[in-house]
Amino acid sequence: MARERPLIAPSPNTFQHMEKKETNPKDRIGIRKVPMSGLPAPVLMECGLVKLHGDLKYGAYNWRHAGVRSSVYFDAALRHLNAWWEGEDIDPDSGEHHIAHAITGLAVLRDSQMFGNCTDDRPKSHKLGWIQEMNERASAMMDKSNNNKPIK
């Protein structure tokens, strides 16, 4: 069995001959890549637990083999969000948070779209811009009422 060599810290003079730089040269390249550090690790880990639950129940990466229907994952995400909205934080089947289920399901849906095996069974859509139009109407109502307090 090979013995590990003890860690030896470099002498303070080791890098003395090198020119001091404001930043590591690799920073210039690294900051131009997709930033992953802003994604909250605890939420990603919750999603990992939800994915594990799904893997054990349906098989790992089952959607990449069988594909998905958009409506099934949309409906599931809304059910989880509605359960949470109505006060149920934890999914009784998995024991994990409903929001983590919604995020994970939407991630699977998006992955299936990117993978090319998603059946897009959405209904025919309204004209583009209808959400913006409705938001503008809501804003106009608020302006007209002189009441800018949220209605709850």
Per-segment meaning from a language model:
Residues 1-152:
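Intrinsically disordered, low-complexity regulatory regions
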